[in-house]
Amino acid sequence: LVQSDNANLLVDVGLGCRATLSALKMYNLSLSDITAIVVTHEHSDHIGGISSFVSHSPVPVYAPKAIANLVAKRATCCDVSGIADATEIADLRIDRYECSHDATACYGYRFSDGTNSVATVTDTGCVTTGLVDFLAPCDRIQLESNHDVDMLKSGPYPYPLKRRILSDFGHLSNAQATQVLSDLVGSNVKSVILAHLSEHNNTAEL
């Protein structure tokens, strides 16, 4: 959830309508308070709840241009708009960061209202050029910290899945996220939310 004076944006909707509504109630919001949905990529855990959401509360849906039609088909939305750099929704400017993930197109986003700036970057298998510069102007960031490498290697996942997660097109490890945060020391970032933590290969304590 990204909020400004004039907008309430959801970044991805992977949960069903009931679970999404329950989460929104924590912020005293309902489905009808959402201004738009912004999609990072086409994997089902990120778009699986969009169809149910828009059937209850029709809102604009935005996705990377390369996958706008694909998202519309998979999420059974009537229309999905392509999002480019410097796209504006209400009072928010949206800039993109291209992630390294095994999707047709996958982006992190930075949202700015002219005074404050927040960003979310998940589902990227490696730290590509420009990530630190993309995050540095933000007041708050949400960054992937998916797995502990040793837990993943010794865990129950089948080898092909382990290889996918550990690849440059998988997910950021705790160590990779730590390096990004170390590089952000001295930047404008004041608050960090670690996201996309694996239930099987990570712990909050780590």
Task: Please annotate each region the language model reported.
Residues 7, 57-60, 186-190:
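A short helix->loop->beta-strand "cap" motif at the edges of active sites that frequently abuts
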Residues 1-27, 107-123, 140:
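Conserved beta-strand hairpin/beta-sheet module of binuclear metal-dependent hydrolase folds
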Residues 11-14, 34-42, 62-65, 119-123, ...:
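Active-site neighborhood of phospho(di)ester-bond hydrolases with catalytic His/Asp-centered motifs
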Residues 17-63:
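Active-site metal-binding motif and surrounding structural segment of the metallo-beta-lactamase
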